Curated annotation (Swiss-Prot):
Primary gene name: kup
Deletion consequences: Deletion of the C-terminal 130 amino acid residues decreases both the affinity and the Vmax of the K(+)-uptake process by 1 order of magnitude.
Organism: Escherichia coli (strain K12)
Any one GO molecular function term: potassium:proton symporter activity
A GO-annotated cellular component: plasma membrane
Protein name: Low affinity potassium transport system protein Kup
Length: 622
């Protein structure tokens, strides 16, 4: 989305508020409550309140304002962000060994996101519904069922897209942030002493007074910055400037006022710790606040769901996940997609989490490990980009990295204390996704190498066919080829078994470039290899979906006329068997076979009419 048009800047900034800041914007529902709930051995004490408020404020300044908005967002790939984009950028100008390490870091970061995405909708919606405990305590047994009902409706509407309701996200979230600010300001006016916590010395004093316990307590403070990765991941939708403008003009002031307002309330009434957010509001405003809190958390959950759809598409297009059905829910916005398999797997996982943990406080114990782990990886990858791509001074880059890690590593280490109380959940889910992605990528590479290791020269084969042609039949045949200079398996098997060839043969390769989009001018490259053979290479970005009909249209513009319903598409279908392997590689091979069996078939991937496809099978040992 462009920000060149100044008249559209307010609208884009408002849209960014509605999408980008949903997760971090709903953190006040539970963050301070978890910090001062007594789990760390101290209750609502003045020094503890001031210490936590100071830590939260300066964490928002350093991590969000300085690290992500100022530094990390400089690293973009044609305007796009995200951990896999950062991985790609970092590996451009490094050695093969270093690139491999950076790829592993990027995949771990992406896997961590899958781990956290299960918790975010659950903790956000449950925190809002728990306002019932204040409004009507007798309804507290309905918190889990109502949370499941709300999220069920949210996941059910995904297939219809969010274009219509999405227009309401921005005004609702703007209203939410204004309410955060208003409630906080009202409380601060009644007890302005709390503003002393803006002094970072209160954070230092907190560590000196509470010593080891204060370090463990960082695991609760990190709840205030969950969702920070969304700022970078959504950069391509809104642009850097609108996201930064929204943060500094609306989001940061609102969050600061609300956190400090909760602190002022707790200094005056320590018993409000049971739910300091909702107790900020007067009695008459509790029900409206509960409703808009529920809406805000649904929007935050929607942003996370959309984020996992986008990450999955990117991973599929880059070859780290098996092909799956991706449905575009908007004709106007290519970023609005729906992936049925991911949607319902995520829904089942979220429901299981809600039923198992029962309360947002229990979920808070599971939150943070994956977030802070991703922060560490982002620091390393982004500073690598600064050194290798931007050619910044190595000592300056080292200082930046040290500064980032001095914050990231303590936060990550403190969250390891949550491992047994729930932190195992996102780590386990992330580990599973990492194994799946690395298995698909490595086994796919092994398969393609196996299929092509004994291949003959494409040029030599074409020359031989032109010199001693087989029986030629009228029409055009397209052979899908994964590599440009390799003879397609389907072509070899057609000649071997049918001993015929069409009058016109097109070898079509669809490849993904290291960019989000490819300009239409560069979409198709056509090369005539002989009087009857053509090579067509169609390039797509990882945010685009390949479409053979579009490729044919581009070919027609270049002089190679093709009609979809008059063309035969020949594809190979591999029947895979496992060869002799060590037990651990055999397990990985079995996982790959499972993924391969459930992968979307090529005709469905590229929107080729099924009645125009001929699949030729071949058995391959891996």
């Amino acid at each position: 989305m462009s920000t060149d048009n100044k008249q559209s800047l307010p609208a884009i900034t408002l849209a960014a508020i509605g999408v980008v800041y949903g997760d971090i914007g709903t953190s006040p529902l539970y963050t301070l409550r978890e910090c001062l709930s007594g789990q760390f051995g101290f209750g609502v004490e003045r020094d503890a309140v001031f210490g936590f408020l100071s830590l939260i404020f300066w964490l928002l300044i350093f991590v969000v304002s300085i690290k992500y908005l100022t530094f990390v967002m400089r690293a973009d790939n044609a305007g796009e962000g995200g951990i896999l984009t950062l991985m790609s950028l970092a590996g451009r100008n490094t050695s093969a060994r270093t690139t491999s390490m950076l790829v592993i870091m990027g995949l771990i970061g992406g896997s961590f996101f899958y781990g956290e995405v299960v918790i975010t909708p659950a903790i956000s919606v449950m925190s809002a519904i728990e306002g019932l405990e204040i409004v009507a305590p007798q309804l507290d047994t309905w918190i889990v069922p109502l949370s499941i009902i709300v999220l069920t409706l949210l996941f059910m509407i995904q297939k219809h897209g969010t274009a219509m309701v999405g227009k309401l996200f921005a005004p609702i979230m703007l209203t939410w942030f204004l309410i955060l600010a208003g409630l906080g300001l009202r409380s601060i006016i009644a007890n302005p002493e709390v503003l002393h916590a803006l002094n970072p010395m209160w954070a230092v004093h907190f560590f000196l007074e509470y010593k080891t316990v204060s370090f463990i307590a960082l695991g609760a403070v990190v709840l205030s910055i969950t969702g920070v990765e969304a700022l970078y991941a959504d950069m391509g939708h809104f642009g850097k400037f609108p996201i930064r403008l929204a943060w500094f003009t609306v989001v940061l002031p609102s969050l600061t006022l609300n956190y400090f307002g909760q602190g002022a309330l707790l200094l005056k009434n320590p018993e409000a710790i049971k739910n300091p957010f909702f107790l900020l509001a007067p009695d008459w405003a509790l029900i409206p606040l509960l409703i808009i809190a529920a809406l805000a958390t649904v929007i935050a959950s929607q942003a996370v769901i959309s984020g996992v759809f986008s990450l999955t598409r990117q991973a599929v297009r880059l070859g780290y996940l098996s092909p799956m059905r991706i449905i575009h829910t908007s004709e106007m916005e290519s970023g609005q997609i729906y992936i049925p398999f991911v949607n319902w797997m995520l829904y089942v996982a979220v429901v299981i989490v809600i039923v198992s943990f029962e309360h947002s406080s229990n979920l808070a114990a599971a939150y943070g490990i994956a977030v802070t782990g991703t922060m560490v990886l982002t620091s390393i990858l982004s500073t690598t980009v600064a050194r290798q791509n931007w050619h910044w001074n190595k000592y300056f880059v080292a200082l930046i990295l040290i500064a980032f890690l001095c914050v990231d590593i303590p936060l990550f280490t403190a969250n390891l204390d949550k491992l047994l109380s729930g932190g195992w959940l996102p780590l386990s889910l992330g580990t599973v996704m990492f194994i799946v992605m690395t298995t698909w990528k490595s086994e796919r590479f092994r398969l393609l190498r196996r299929m092509h290791e004994h291949g003959n020269s494409l040029e030599a084969m074409i020359a031989s066919l032109e010199k001693s042609p087989p029986v030629r039949v009228p029409g055009t045949a397209v052979y899908m080829s994964r590599a440009i200079n390799v003879i397609p398996f389907a072509l070899m098997h057609n000649l071997k078994h049918n001993k015929v060839l069409h009058e016109r043969v097109i070898l079509l390769t669809l490849r993904t470039e290291d960019a989000p989009y490819v300009h239409n001018v560069r979409r198709v490259q056509i090369e005539q290899l002989s009087p009857t053979f053509w090579r067509v290479v169609a390039s797509y970005g990882w945010r685009e979906t390949p479409n053979v009909e579009e490729v044919f249209h581009r070919c027609g513009l270049e002089g190679l006329s093709c009609r979809m319903m008059e063309t035969s598409f020949f594809m190979s279908h591999e029947s895979l068997i496992l060869g002799k392997r060590p037990w651990y590689l055999r397990l990985r091979g079995k996982l790959y076979l499972l993924l391969q069996r459930n992968a979307l078939r090529a005709p469905d991937q590229f929107e080729i009419p099924p009645n125009r496809v001929i699949e030729l099978g071949t058995q391959v040992e891996i």
